[in-house]
Amino acid sequence: MSLQPQSETLSFEAEVKQLLHLVAHSLYSNKEIFLRELISNSSDAADKLRYQALSDAALYENDADLKIWIDFDKDNRTITIRDNGIGMSREEVIENLGTIAKSGTRAFRELLAEKKAEDSQLIGQFGVGFYSAFIVADRVVVRTRRAGMKADQGVEWESTGEGEYTLKNIDKPTRGTEVVLHLKESEEEFLDPLRLRAIITKYSDHILLPIVMKKIKTSGADDEDKNETPEEEVVNRANALWVLPKDKIKDEEYKELYKHIAHDFEDPLAWVHNKVEGKLEYTTLLYIPARAPFDIWNREGQRGLKLYVKRIFIMDDAEHFMPMYLRFVKGIVDSNDLPLNISRELLQSNEVINKIKAGCVKRILSLLEDLAKNDKEKYASFWKAFGQVLKEGPAEDFANRDRIANLLRFASTHNDTDEQNVSLQDYISRMKPEQNRIYYIVADTYTSAKNSPLLEVFRKKDIEVLLMSDRVDEWLVAHLNEFEGKSLQSIAKGTLDLGDLEKEEKVETEKFEKDFDELLKQFKEVLGEKIKDVRITHRLTDSPTCVVFDENEMSGHLQRLLIQTGQDFMQAKPILEINPSHPLILRVKNESDKTRFNRWADLLLNQALLAEGEQLKDPASFVKGLNELLLDS
């Protein structure tokens, strides 16, 4: 076994360099948050030690009195944040202080490359954390040792926040981490004990761990004994905010607790605080973030709530309290009815967990319902951030399907905008008296849906159609068949059936069918295996053709999604529908030249496929045939 080098210099990952630059230049107006972030890290370290010590008490090393110490030295211009939490090994120092978590590296790079995200958005998504130290410091030294390791396995990390950092082995008799900030010339304000106390009160009063500082000496106090150990005092409340009555907690305190537990830079969008008493006793404090995290679509990523048992931290990311479609929710569950040594495996089959989960879901859905009813602007912000995730709900949560459906929002032909602000209840309130279905179309983009020829008869009759273009929409409509007794109907599948709304058109179509029987046979003969069928339609008013799919087959949009994800399936063939009143169809009907007829048949099918969003298998042949028809005209 080779010994670790005594000292070495390593380079930061490229993403860390960029994050350091952002932190140093973009957070200067709110520079005091460095203390909040470093205290939060120390608090997390204590939580991890408590949890691991449940199964290995020796990790406490005869010191179970966990604290955070804050000190400063005016002469040397330093601030020190020290804890006796879990600490770090050499490998953990490199992983935690030299890299961004691998799950976030690619997303961070993509956001930077796009140049779309504001600096605050990047910082909010990836966390400021330890790197906030460089807002006020031009040199940072970290000394740490992991609990359970030998005293000579301590590590010292040092950097000026530029391209490199140095590591060396040190002796560290006590476990935990010490962060020493060498302040920039312009940051003397933080060498004031009153200023530091004010920041702690503002951001970290709720931290469960005692935060300790030296007592401020009053003027005239005896200062003769220079060697006397200064007296210490706890400068935060050090209690669990969530156990206090709601009327005793200020909004700012709720917001700061959120930033601590979610490691977010922004205020939450909304929250709900609830205490349940009776046979089952637990407290929940649940937050909805203002912005989606970078890994929201990684269903395997870390998610969940912080779990406490009788105010003792048990685990981060306890995913069993929230279904996948609410994976964006952050917060705390504190139960009196779970054992302290509960594991993730036991969480899966615990009846108490199931009851708490049902309560958490109920609270979040009620919060969203309240926002949707009483604060439409805030709900619109929520929908923009998390609407696509909520659309997974009807497939995953049958018990709450109707409540979730009532929260869904869509674009529609009623509004000339891609903003998703139409609820299913809005749609029903505008339905025609004779109408008994909720009509929708799913397309690759909003523009493609809005301009689909399939909408022509609906516009003619002033029937609203929901315009869906999110990737999750096919999954949604497959599991949401009806709402308030009205069935959902795709206008891109099956034959058109508007009931009493289309009596005249049906009569007219029947007249055309005999006259166009020969033309339909010719189309079938020419197009062969490319199509399933050809038929007359009355759904078109301006376009010559369109394609649809059988009622029980997958839509073209769903088939394209499956192809993109590499799925193996039996592809459905389109049905070509023709508008018997369109001049192009009448021209083709009278075409006597077989070659030209074949070109027209191909052209009419391909343009219908393009309008449906399909990518042509042979676009060059399509262009060639089109050019030949233009030259013949």
UniProtKB/Swiss-Prot annotation:
UniProt keyword terms in alphabetical order: ATP-binding, Chaperone, Cytoplasm, Nucleotide-binding, Stress response
Family membership: Belongs to the heat shock protein 90 family.
Region described as B: spans on this chain: 345-560
Protein localization: Cytoplasm
PROSITE patterns reported for this sequence: HSP90
GO terms, molecular function: ATP binding; ATP hydrolysis activity; ATP-dependent protein folding chaperone; unfolded protein binding
Lineage: Bacteria, Pseudomonadati, Pseudomonadota, Gammaproteobacteria, Legionellales
Record note on quaternary structure: Homodimer.
Protein name stated in the entry: Chaperone protein HtpG
One Pfam family linked to the record: HATPase_c_3
Residues covered by region (A): 1-344
Gene Ontology cellular component list: cytoplasm
CDD domains: HATPase_Hsp90-like
Protein function: Molecular chaperone. Has ATPase activity.
InterPro entries reported in the protein's UniProt record: HATPase_C_sf (IPR036890), Heat_shock_protein_90_CS (IPR019805), HSP90_C (IPR037196), Hsp90_fam (IPR001404), Hsp90_N (IPR020575), Ribosomal_Su5_D2-typ_SF (IPR020568)
Database matches in SMART domains: HATPase_c
Region called C, residue ranges: 561-633
